[in-house]
């Protein structure tokens, strides 16, 4: 519901961006965590953001190897003081994760049985998302961006910083767990 936090721990797949957009439509605050983080780093961000739901992928695919996300998520939840009650897992065919009864749900099953909802009205200063700093100089800090400020900053920076005009193509190699990837992908 509006104002709830939803942590997204997924590889760079379309479902990650769709999850961000779904949260925005519902007025929920999405918290994207870089998929390469180990359980202790993820647990730190779970404790701080206190998400009502976690959306995760079963795995990520890197050159020459598969990275299983679900065991890292399970360990992070075990380590975290804040206990998440529901996890929606996007099962990738290359690595089907074991789901924990009562806590974990197959995201595709939920999508298949979903229905359309109207967008929830939000104020320009309502939080849109939280992204965490890397934590290299101390504890990671959750940076809150609001709906209006984020939209205005993106529009302005695309032209003023990158010189882009309508119809131009932009490519960013960053992960959506970092501000460049989150903002420009």
Where are these regions (language model features)?
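Conserved AMP-binding/adenylate-forming
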Residues: 1-43, 171-176
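Short beta-strand segments
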Residues: 8, 88-91, 146, 172
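Flexible loop/turn segments at secondary-structure boundaries
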Residues: 14-17, 95-97, 137-140, 152, ...
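Conserved pre-ATP/AMP-binding loop-to-beta segment of ANL
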Residues: 87-90, 100-132, 139, 149, ...
């Amino acid at each position: 519901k509006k104002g709830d936090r939803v942590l997204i721990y997924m590889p760079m797949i379309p479902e990650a961006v769709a999850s961000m957009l779904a949260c925005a439509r519902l007025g929920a605050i999405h918290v994207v965590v870089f998929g390469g983080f180990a359980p202790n780093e993820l647990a730190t961000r779970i404790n701080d953001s206190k998400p009502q739901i976690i959306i995760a992928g079963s795995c990520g695919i890197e050159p020459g190897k598969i990275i299983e996300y679900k065991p890292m998520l399970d360990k992070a939840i075990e380590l975290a003081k804040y206990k998440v009650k529901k996890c929606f897992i996007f099962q990738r065919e290359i690595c089907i994760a074991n789901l924990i009864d009562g806590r974990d749900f197959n995201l595709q099953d939920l999508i298949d049985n979903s229905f359309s909802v109207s967008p929830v009205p939000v104020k320009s200063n309502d939080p849109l998302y939280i992204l965490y700093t890397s934590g290299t100089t101390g504890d990671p800090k959750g940076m809150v961006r609001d709906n209006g400020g984020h939209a205005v900053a993106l529009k302005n920076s695309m032209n003023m910083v990158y010189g882009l005009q309508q119809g131009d193509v932009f490519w960013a190699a960053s992960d959506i767990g970092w501000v460049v990837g989150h903002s420009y992908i």
